[in-house]
A protein has these predicted regions:
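Outer-membrane beta-barrel translocator domains and adjoining extracellular loop/strand segments
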Residues: 97-105, 153-158, 195-201, 255-266, ...
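The canonical Cys-X-X-Cys-His
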Residues: 43-53
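C-terminal segment of classical bacterial N-terminal signal peptides
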Residues: 21-31
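N-terminal secretory signal peptides that target proteins for export/translocation
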Residues: 1-11
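Detector for outer-membrane/organellar transmembrane beta-barrel domains
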Residues: 287-420
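Outer membrane beta-barrel
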Residues: 58-59, 89-96, 103-104, 116-254, ...
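Transmembrane beta-barrel outer-membrane domains
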Residues: 80-82, 120-124, 152-156, 223-227, ...
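Outer-membrane beta-barrel "beta-signal"
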Residues: 45, 414-420, 454-466
């Protein structure tokens, strides 16, 4: 087991490599400004696409840029001619109300790996190198190579490669005036291609740490397939009103997963194609933006790539909604919510655990977050999460069932954000830094109210893009 000190040395080496690469880019740019690739390509500062000038949360303009396949131009000069490369680094300090247990001979089931402290851990959470922007013509990409400082692993992160174009029936002899933006997305994580910040990949919270307590459960569509599958979806936006998307995912081979840095007993293999769909309505009434949507996925999964006991079957269906007040960019108000219902038939996992029970189980996940942003610099977000589900078994070291537990959990997240750069009037307006204070408070954790507050977590996060 490698210690945090050794992990830190390796993380510094990876970060130094990123900075060295970025320095080559910086030295070729007037005034030596660090320019994220999307900003260089479009000539726009980060606040045009992002409500808080940094992070995944998109403005209507940012959603249009993604819908159009990351190919929009507008930049000029030396910066616009540079390769579409960017770097990113994240770190955090995490405190929990009660010390966590650390794995050892006496605590084999500790919640933290050996080498970490029970509390007040600093983690170099992530360092990433991106290719993000136009590839050629109407083809663009967002792709990520990531070093996970907690897991001490280099892997392929999120990837979304798109072809996109536009077609207007008004330009034809047909008696219709319909405008279509259409495209194809090749990606490796369901919902990574989504335009809205209600779906799992780009939903709040945008930062976290590997050392924070793991509470509740998540549906399959929420990260369980990331970088382990490849998918193709076709989409269209009609009259900037109706969005339609459909496609399917299949598993990468075991060797491909290994080459992407995905290994371990929690790997999954899809048995056949897994259909995915998305539909949404959106409209902007003079700065009041509304969206209402639905998305879902059906998958047959071979857990751990071991087909001895067959497959687990999942059907995930969700509804989501977004409101943004963007009429006055000094004061941005947002409300976002989603509910995901997962129907499960876990016959493979039951067979492996010797569980004789039959029938379907379920998992329900509700998320709501409210946000206020001042001057696209200072942000306050409050979020509420609730998880409900069927009983699931707890296994001992030899795989026997020793107890049953529900994943039921209730908690809130409060976050303060400061983003000093990314605006047209900012010093170094095309580089970016996001700092945040985050507190997570639990009233229920893993099916019990008793001692749920011991999981309460305070984090200080720093996030740099260059």
């Amino acid at each position: 087991m490698q210690t945090p000190l050794k992990r830190t040395y390796e993380a510094r080496f990876f970060l130094a490599s990123l900075i060295s690469l970025s320095s080559v880019i910086l030295l070729t740019i007037p005034d030596a400004e660090a320019l994220p690739s999307f900003s260089r390509q479009t000539g726009q500062n980060c606040s045009v696409c992002h409500t808080q000038s940094f992070g995944p949360n998109l403005t209507p303009f940012g959603r249009d840029f993604k819908l159009g396949g990351y190919t929009m131009g507008g930049g000029s000069g030396t910066a616009a001619k540079l390769p579409a490369l960017s770097g990113m680094a994240l770190g955090s300090l995490t405190n929990t109300q009660k010390d966590q247990t650390v794995q050892s001979l006496n605590e084999p089931n500790g919640t933290l790996p050996s080498g970490w402290k029970g509390n007040n851990n600093f983690t170099f959470d992530q360092a990433s190198l991106f290719y993000a922007g136009r590839v050629y013509g109407k083809v663009g990409a967002f792709s990520e190579l990531t070093f996970d400082g907690f897991a001490n692993r280099l892997s392929m992160g999120n990837a979304d490669i798109r072809f996109a174009d536009r077609f207007d029936l008004d330009d034809t002899s047909l008696p219709f005036d319909l405008d279509f933006t259409y495209g194809i997305s090749l990606n490796n994580n369901p919902t990574v291609q989504d335009l809205w910040n209600t779906t799992p990949v780009w939903g709040f919270p945008y930062t976290g740490s590997g050392v924070q307590p793991s509470v509740g459960a998540t549906p399959l569509i929420d990260g369980a397939l990331g970088s382990q599958v490849g998918g193709a979806t076709a989409y269209t936006m009609i009259n900037n009103l109706l969005y339609l998307e459909a496609g399917a995912y299949g598993s990468f081979s075991s060797s491909t997963q290994n080459s992407f840095g995905i290994a371990g007993p929690d790997r999954v293999n899809l048995n056949g194609a897994a259909p995915y769909w998305r539909v949404a309505l959106q409209h902007d009434w003079k700065g009041h933006y509304f969206q209402l949507g639905h998305y879902g996925m059906i998958a047959n999964v071979v857990p751990g790539r071991d087909s001895t006991f067959g497959t687990n079957n999942y059907t995930d269906v969700a509804v989501d909604a977004t409101y943004q007040y963007m009429a006055n960019l000094k004061h941005i108000f947002e409300a976002k919510t989603t509910y995901i219902y997962e129907d499960q038939n876990l016959s493979a996992s039951r067979g492996a655990a010797g569980d004789p029970s039959t029938g379907n189980t379920y998992l329900g996940t509700y998320r709501l977050n409210l946000a206020y942003t001042f001057d696209q610099t200072y942000g306050l977000t409050f979020a509420y999460n609730q998880i409900n589900g069927s009983h699931s078994p707890i296994l001992n070291d030899v795989g026997a069932i020793v107890d049953q537990v529900r994943p039921n959990s209730k908690y809130y997240t409060a976050e303060l954000v400061y983003v000093p750069f990314g605006k047209s009037n900012s010093y170094l307006y095309l580089t970016n830094l996001r700092t945040s204070l985050q507190y997570i408070g639990y009233s229920q954790a893993n099916g019990t109210n008793t001692d749920a507050q011991f999981n309460n977590t305070f984090m200080v996060n720093g996030w740099l893009a260059f």
